[in-house]
């Protein structure tokens, strides 16, 4: 699924019916989705995903950033990640978790993977629970 929705600008992208149980690469899946405001990834099964590099990133410095919410049922399972992951949320300025949190991390290492979770008190994440 690498780059599958690259540059797509559907305001509300609902992928809750996608079967992702055998996917191993979600890198750049939503890169440069400048006008997408909400992503619905309710049933994403990420237990086999090894690469989340630039999954939600904006590659251009002055890109329009409209993404505010990513909706999920569960945290992403990152147990299969087997390499260094970069820039998962690079350039995202408007994205917030369900409790309003903004993750703080360098973005240049696996620290960004910690934000692939539901935003909870004491645990910042970029996801909003459905």
Q: Model-predicted segments: where are they?
A:
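Negatively charged
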Residues: 2-130
């Amino acid at each position: 699924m690498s780059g599958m929705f690259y540059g797509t600008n559907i305001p509300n992208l609902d992928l809750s019916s996608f079967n992702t149980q055998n996917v191993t690469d979600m890198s750049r899946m939503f890169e440069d989705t400048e006008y997408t405001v909400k992503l619905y990834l309710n049933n994403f099964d990420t237990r086999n995903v090894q690469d989340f590099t630039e999954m939600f990133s904006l590659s251009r410095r002055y890109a329009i950033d409209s993404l505010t919410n990513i909706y999920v049922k569960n945290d992403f399972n990152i147990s299969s990640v087997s390499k260094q992951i970069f820039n998962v949320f690079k350039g995202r300025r408007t994205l917030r978790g369900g409790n309003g949190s903004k993750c703080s991390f360098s973005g240049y290492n696996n620290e960004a993977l910690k934000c692939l979770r539901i935003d909870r008190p004491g645990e910042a994440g970029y996801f909003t629970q459905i």
